[in-house]
Swiss-Prot record:
It comes from Prochlorococcus marinus (strain SARG / CCMP1375 / SS120). Belongs to the CN hydrolase family. Apolipoprotein N-acyltransferase subfamily. Keywords: Acyltransferase, Cell inner membrane, Cell membrane, Membrane, Transferase, Transmembrane, Transmembrane helix. The gene is lnt. This is Apolipoprotein N-acyltransferase. It is an enzyme of class 2 (transferase). Pathway: Protein modification; lipoprotein biosynthesis (N-acyl transfer).
Length: 494
């Protein structure tokens, strides 16, 4: 009983430390943090409550930018309630993360899996691969939920592009599974070393596998094909969200937009892009646009308000076509409808309705895939747009009032989307990041964060179809079914 109690408390400590390391890895980047943290996760698997702590602290640390929601007085929340509401939202996300990871550990404790955990290393590996694939597929599913999801699959970037290159075959879900398998490898080496068991063979096998995986990833990243080039101007508005609807900013914005269009035209751009939410519903340009404009903004369709990417043709003052945001931010843009209750959400513009799920947008400038803000985390949906013919990816966002840590996570997501789809990606955001991400995952910063300005880039477009775009999660699902069949066969022999 005493030994069990000590094991439990050690698991709690290991889960807490692992979660903190995961939080650092997810928010700052760094594969070493993630591998050690996932090693701690495997070490705590016998105790779901310890695994809960891992998920809790991982989310609390990596999502601490949520606290920058405070103050909420600009949308009418009394100052006395502002910080408690921000803390409640932040802590609720942490609880959700902890519960999800604890549920995953409970799956590993069902008899079908549990017998493999206490058997040979080969059988344990089947158990680990199965649970890792389940985790990876769940991450893909969570990326389709209303919540902004930044998981293990995204944590390789920006520091290990070569290993992340494998996403061109099996996407972010496959990378998440790989991270967990590598964490188990680290844990097995530490466990063997502690017990005085042979570990050099396992260490050498893992290192050789890592080298091979990096070589394959490097080859995949080098395989790019481009058909033509576009010259695009990017306008980073740098308007604080809390000041956007002041009389001063409402007067200044139309003039600043016209000045930016003139500057873009003088720089020889084919068209200009402005961030999410730049234009209010019904707002027109002060003068005919000297070049085509793609601008984030709001529009009303059949008494519904949509957050959209609006297209203004050259010589026009009003938009001619649009694609609407599908994935809305809970509380910020959307709240569940209740009888007799009209929710506006935590937004000055009020509630927003979702558009079509497809991110494919075909306009006069050529087909592209559009991600508005958090839609960038759904690689599966963007891959469908690429398969439908999109030649590049445009991500527009407004990440104010959040700090630079969220911008780093957003850029990591942008890198992964570029790698998965073999497409160049442009990110244009209110306060940043405003960058171009090459299909190899390399980042070219165009405008420094928290500065206003217009920058011009040349983007190469492509019609190449990557393995992930073609097959999606089919390889992961097939691999999981095969591993489960092997486990069932071993169970039958036992």
């Amino acid at each position: 009983m005493l030994a069990l109690s000590r094991s439990k408390y050690f698991a709690f400590l290991t889960g807490t430390v692992g979660g903190l390391l995961a939080g650092v890895g997810l928010s700052q980047g760094g594969v070493v943090f993630i591998w050690i943290s996932t090693a701690c996760l495997w070490a705590s698997m016998a105790f779901p409550s310890a695994v809960f702590l891992w998920g809790l602290f991982a989310i609390l640390l990596s999502y601490r930018w949520l606290l920058y929601l405070h103050p909420l007085t600009w949308i009418g929340v009394p100052i006395a309630f502002s910080l408690p509401i921000a803390i409640l939202i932040w802590f609720s996300c942490g609880l959700l993360g902890g519960l999800l990871v604890a549920l995953w550990s409970l799956i590993g404790q069902i008899p079908f899996f549990q017998r493999r955990l206490n058997s040979s290393t080969k059988d344990q590996l089947l158990y680990v691969i199965a649970l890792s694939l389940i985790w990876g597929l769940v991450e893909v599913g969570l990326a389709k939920s209303p919540f902004f999801w930044f998981g293990l699959g995204d944590s390789l970037l920006p520091y290990d592009r070569w290993l992340a290159g494998l996403a061109r075959w099996f996407g972010s879900g496959g990378l998440a599974a790989l991270q967990l398998i590598l964490g188990w490898w680290v844990w097995k080496i530490i466990f063997a070393f502690k017990k005085g068991s042979p570990w050099l063979g396992l260490f050498a096998l893992g290192v050789c596998s890592l080298l091979l995986a990096h070589c394959i990833g490097w080859i995949l990243l080098a395989d790019n094909e481009f058909t033509s080039s576009k010259r695009i101007a990017l306008w980073q508005t740098n308007i604080p969200t809390r000041q956007k609807f002041t009389l001063r900013e409402l007067k200044r914005l139309p003039i600043s937009l016209q000045d930016a269009l003139e500057e873009a035209d003088n720089l020889g751009a084919d068209w200009m892009v402005a961030p999410e939410g730049t234009l209010s519903a019904g707002q027109n340009l002060l003068a005919p646009s000297p070049l085509p404009l793609l601008s984030g903004g709001f529009r009303r369709v059949k008494n519904k308000q949509m957050s959209s990417l609006l297209v203004f043709n050259e010589g026009s003052t009003s938009y001619s076509s649009a694609i609407d945001k599908h994935r809305l931010v809970p509380l910020g843009e959307w709240l569940p409808s209740l009888p007799g209750v009209n929710w506006n959400g935590l937004s000055f513009v009020g509630g927003v309705d979702p558009g079509d799920a497809s991110r494919f947008f075909d306009w006069d400038g050529g087909p592209l895939a559009v991600a508005i803000c958090y839609e960038l985390s759904d690689g599966n949906n963007l891959a469908k747009a690429i398969f439908d013919g999109a030649e590049w990816i445009l991500a527009i966002a407004n990440l104010d009032p959040y700090p630079i840590s969220l911008q780093r996570q957003f850029l990591a997501l942008a890198q992964l989307r570029s790698i998965e789809s073999a497409r160049n990606l442009i990110s244009v955001a209110n306060t940043g990041p405003t960058s171009m991400i090459l299909s190899s995952g390399k980042i070219k910063s165009i405008i420094e964060p928290f500065n206003e300005g217009v920058g011009v880039i040349d983007i190469n477009v492509s019609q190449k179809i990557s393995g992930y775009v073609r097959w999606g999660e089919i390889p992961l699902i097939s691999s999981l079914l095969i591993v489960l069949c092997f486990i069932a066969r071993l169970k039958g022999k036992a």
